[in-house]
Amino acid sequence: MAQVFNFSSGPAMLPTEVLKLAQQELRDWHDLGTSVMEISHRGKEFIQVAEEAEQDFRDLLSIPSNYKVLFCHGGGRGQFAGVPLNLLGDRTTADYVDAGYWAASAIKEAKKYCAPQIIDAKITVDGKRAVKPMREWQLSDNAAYLHYCPNETIDGIAIDETPDFGPGVVVTADFSSTILSAPLDVSRYGVIYAGAQKNIGPAGLTLVIVREDLLGKAHENCPSILDYTVLNDNDSMFNTPPTFAWYLSGLVFKWLKAQGGVAAMHKINQQKAQLLYGVIDNSDFYRNDVAQANRSRMNVPFQLADNALDKVFLEESFAAGLHALKGHRVVGGMRASIYNAMPIEGVKALTDFMIDFERRHG
């Protein structure tokens, strides 16, 4: 079978080594004669899987001991509700930074529970889309927390700054598309959440990192499966968790540690992004409209000079084993998602194709 590189924004490519191991273990896990999908989540065998996965995740991000890690249902959208339901307390407002599609989606959900103070961080720099630096974010005095999205998958916009607003500001962030791709100072945040389907594992699992002093504040009507305290008190097993996604994510954590950890992966991700943006920037045929300071290393949207060629580009790239390059319906064009599991060889195959496509159609 010819090599295929999957540039999907999520569910995304998984490491080949992980898929091969999962395939080997699928029908007979650890000589039990059953699949890991079939064993009880409360049995000692799966408890070991769960504990190892959490410890490996903690090791990868150097998560401080005063933070809890929760393995949840609901995806990022579930946490759009989970954050206000757990953190508002007796306050009625929170600060929300709007820098793109997913930040705006979080704001829309938050409006069901509070009156969000919206910080419009979208700006233009030299004709390209950008984000205001954090020092220009105007925070309100009465906000229960601050929420932002460090990486916008659709817009291809990243906020790489580390928040430093002082101990009185509870910072929450949607790291769904950038978790484990670069070093992260967890201690600067109150809550970090991430859907698994981009840099962690398959869809169906959501990880939440929550500072323990923020537990016990959930709204009385908060659904139990979104209540951080309930989930923590039950070791993320208040109801049956997505066990197969949890298991596969654990394999990804071990794979990532074997690659040298997050710092090593960050260097590779920088190389991949530089390679792809380099081809775009050195061409009049392709363009990216995000200012360099805010370009995403995970999701690279680009347009062709003649959008009439979009269909041809997608057909030819797919035939060449370069899949899922169609841009989001909101913005059109192309998008290459190059998460941790995408090898640099995949990006090189894409850039070689792009150069050849321009030669033939430019």
Curated annotation (Swiss-Prot):
SUPFAM superfamilies: PLP-dependent transferases. It catalyses: O-phospho-L-serine + 2-oxoglutarate = 3-phosphooxypyruvate + L-glutamate; 4-(phosphooxy)-L-threonine + 2-oxoglutarate = (R)-3-hydroxy-2-oxo-4-phosphooxybutanoate + L-glutamate. PROSITE patterns: AA_TRANSFER_CLASS_5 (PS00595). GO terms for biological process: L-serine biosynthetic process; pyridoxine biosynthetic process. L-glutamate binds at S9, R42. Binds 1 pyridoxal phosphate per subunit. Pathway: Amino-acid biosynthesis; L-serine biosynthesis; L-serine from 3-phospho-D-glycerate: step 2/3; Cofactor biosynthesis; pyridoxine 5'-phosphate biosynthesis; pyridoxine 5'-phosphate from D-erythrose 4-phosphate: step 3/5. Its main location: cytoplasm. Its cofactor is pyridoxal 5'-phosphate. It comes from the Bacteria. Coiled coil: none annotated. InterPro entries: Aminotrans_V_dom (IPR000192), Aminotrans_V_PyrdxlP_BS (IPR020578), Pser_aminoTfrase (IPR022278), PyrdxlP-dep_Trfase (IPR015424), PyrdxlP-dep_Trfase_major (IPR015421), PyrdxlP-dep_Trfase_small (IPR015422). It is an enzyme of class 2 (transferase). Its EC number is 2.6.1.52. Keywords: Amino-acid biosynthesis, Aminotransferase, Cytoplasm, Pyridoxal phosphate, Pyridoxine biosynthesis, Serine biosynthesis, Transferase. Gene3D superfamilies: Aspartate Aminotransferase, domain 1, Type I PLP-dependent aspartate aminotransferase-like (Major domain). Pyridoxal 5'-phosphate binds at G76, R77, W102, T153, D174, Q197, N239, T240. The modification N6-(pyridoxal phosphate)lysine is found at K198. GO terms for cellular component: cytoplasm. It is found in: Cytoplasm. One of its GO terms (molecular function) is pyridoxal phosphate binding. Belongs to the class-V pyridoxal-phosphate-dependent aminotransferase family. SerC subfamily. Homodimer. This is Phosphoserine aminotransferase. It comes from Salmonella arizonae (strain ATCC BAA-731 / CDC346-86 / RSK2980).
